[in-house]
Amino acid sequence: YGSDESLLLKQALECGICQAGVNVYSIGRAGISELSYAVNRFGGEFGILIGANISGHARLISAGGMLPDEKLLDRIGSIADDRDYRSVGLSQTGCVTDFSAVREIYVAELEKILPDRFKGVNVDIRTYDVRKATIADRLFHGRNDIDGERIIFNLSADGTKVSAYSEKTSYVMWEKLVAMYAGVCFEKGLAVALPENFPSNADAAAEDHCGRLYRYENNADIAKDVAVSTHNMFVYDGLYLASAVTSYLSEQGITLQKALCDVPDAYTSSRFVGITMSRENKKKIFSELGCSAEGEITMGKTHAVIRPLRDKKGITVFAESVSCEQAAAFCEDITSRIKGIFK
């Protein structure tokens, strides 16, 4: 995925898989977005993302960004516990094929949905991933309308989600962006597949547009055929979603606020906390609250994001939920916990 340690772990895993008589297609240093695309586009059974930041770990995914069937996961766990690994003879050993070119094919897929030049849109992508930042610069820098609406997209640490910010909309959570673009797909007559725990505003969008919305839990569900469709990548690929939303705004000549006005409300609440957001304080707050690297917190169907002011002299807490009461309560709880940290 990134480090030399993860590369060594990947090579060791490849040897074990080949010894079991299974072929491996290696895409090299890449993220879950490229891996998911490769599994979808070229009909792979599964994708494995290897990481080794603190300790070695592997993430198993199947087509459409879905989790593998629970029965399969249980079987894998049982084999690992019993150390009952399959091994074949030399003549049946699998082979490793260099499939790194898929990373360039993935970028080309994103370029296909973007116009040569944006009209009325000026996009900036924020991410901690240097590789993602390089791809984003290639996709957006030369296409931006410098006089257009300024929109900042914040990619999640693993690149699967994205939130947005503009002066007129303030922060827009991933869930609302997904619901908005799902509506665009419904207008085009395309079906959409979402995780079963996705907020209900997507169902309301489907009703408004007479769209076909499927829910899935894992790759055993009937929604798999829809989930693996290229247009459904916006559900599990933050960069694809940012590209698709930007393309739609440019094509329609509308602002992000206008595009979101027809999306069913996901109720929001916000609070200000007057605490200096130094690097030490930020680390302490995120650690105590269990935030992601982007300052996001999720509890059931309620989501929140913590953002420092530009001058670092305060924090704004934004929360979104299926009801106004839940959003306000969650926002108030986070605010109280932050204040409690510095008592």
Which residues are covered by each model-predicted region?
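N-terminal small/polar loop signature for handling phosphorylated ligands or for N-terminal nucleophile
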Residues: 1-58, 137-171
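Short hydrophobic beta-strand segments
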Residues: 1-4, 120-130, 190-196
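Short, highly selective alpha-helical patches that border small-molecule cofactor pockets
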Residues: 6, 10, 14, 133-136, ...
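Alpha-helical scaffold segments in soluble metabolic enzymes
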Residues: 12, 34-37, 75, 105-113, ...
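Short, surface-exposed connector motifs at secondary-structure boundaries
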Residues: 19-22, 116-122, 185-191, 209
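Short, acidic/small-residue loops that bind anionic groups at enzyme active sites
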Residues: 26, 62-82, 171-187, 217
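Gly/Ser/Thr-enriched, mixed-charge loops and adjacent short helices
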Residues: 55-151, 166
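Phosphate-binding and adjacent anionic-ligand microenvironments
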Residues: 156-160, 165-170, 174-343
